[in-house]
Amino acid sequence: MGSGSRERIVEVFDALDAELDRLDEVSFEVLTTPERLRSLERLECLVRRLPAVGHALINQLDAQASEEELGGTLCCALANRLRITKPDAALRIADAADLGPRRALTGEPLAPQLTATATAQRQGLIGEAHVKVIRALFRPPARRGGCVHPPGRRSRPGRQSRSISSRRAGPLRPAGHGLATPRRRPHRHRTRPQTRHHPEQPALRRYVTAKWLPDPPSAGHL
């Protein structure tokens, strides 16, 4: 990533704003159908490239800014300044950690954690949905033993203790009546909703696997 003065950075952002204003004023009525599709393709490529610029800024804030400067945590600062939700802010921080440029403790520049994915994003070849699939492929599976629960499931001590108590006390009758004979409960047919996968996910997974997974180990992780 190149370096620049403050004036140069402001100049580049101002030029980008001006060009977007010009593009917004353009009418596409003269274009043919193939030309419109090509224009949408170029626009999509530009949209996909923009987050890569933000990764560097977020990582620098994470490494250099204090909570006093930010007015709180980095997640809260991004949510307030960018007018986004905290989950969205947390996701951007995680994306920047995986796809943005890094520095070692000695100050030496380091490649992104997911090198090939970061390169593809900077080139506009993949977008948010592709990145989500790639990160899911490399996410470690949740442990089911011990105190670690799968994502989306939380232990509920109150409900669990009530369930255990009911199982232990269920077979007992009032005092003097001995053990109760378990009664059969009528079988209830329950209709479970079928799990439907997003139609784009299998296609994205096949595309990503064929396109980006063949990286040799020496080139770094994806």
From Swiss-Prot:
Per UniProt, the ranges with Low complexity bias are 160-169
Q: Where is the composition biased (Basic residues)?
A: 182-196
Give one Pfam hit by family name.
DUF222
Q: Which InterPro entries match?
A: DUF222
Q: Which domain of life is it from?
A: Bacteria
Specify where the region named Disordered lies, as residue ranges. 142-222
Similarity remark: Belongs to the Rv1128c/1148c/1588c/1702c/1945/3466 family.
Name it: Uncharacterized protein MT3572
